[in-house]
């Protein structure tokens, strides 16, 4: 329960509010410095005007305060909503990176003129510098080649499905990092918050889709995808592991690419994230691209091979010696034909990765 003067939630679809937005600027990687910017949408639902000051505290991974930024004094009329801002320099910064999921805690506070707390919100986030261009992607001033996994967004485990605790999400996503992957391309729909936060912790870059229909679409179906992307960006824009916004599983038109970029520019203009899709080599406005089954290169677009080892096996089958003792290839028909590619075991998948 909050005061009638409060910081909003990042729930745009239901509440039409955008919440907190925290981002870095003026990165000095070698000098370990970054300017931390905190923006908060504040609403006054009181029957009278309310005044407050806006503050931000930065805590490191050990809970030690490493930054305290004092903002301006604001006055909001009854029913008014306003975005307030504060920024300051963070020294001796730890930059989030592949395999190094360093996270800070940012506390944004509203205080009355007498110094009493009106409202505070705690946000976990990290800071990293990104650059896209000349066919390359740079993370913290170093070029990095993308390689990893295209994982079903369900990210399920045998026996429990999607209902997994956070530690199991960390274990699962850390396996991707420890096997040499620096990227997870979630398939078709936006992942749940637990997996997003898990990737923050283990240092795994994410490509985040909103919604997808296996191809570009028109009319109301495209409008729904835009709405999903807007909602997903607002809800997840403080998670440093998200670096790519995917407009669709396959390429989209130039007009649609521009619409997706407009959403990113409005709601995440400073997050250092690229908006693109697969098969976008011919769309100059796309900020990254890739191919399904082969390697391609571009003078402009950072690209990666997005499904070079396609495997549709169900994760619920380990091997023939483990419960449920599934025989390799057994299972229902798909469109009247055997579906071996779906009904095989994970030991077969592991062997194919080595091959």
Regions from the language model: what does each represent?
Residues 170-178, 182-355:
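Substrate-binding/catalytic cleft of secreted carbohydrate-active enzymes
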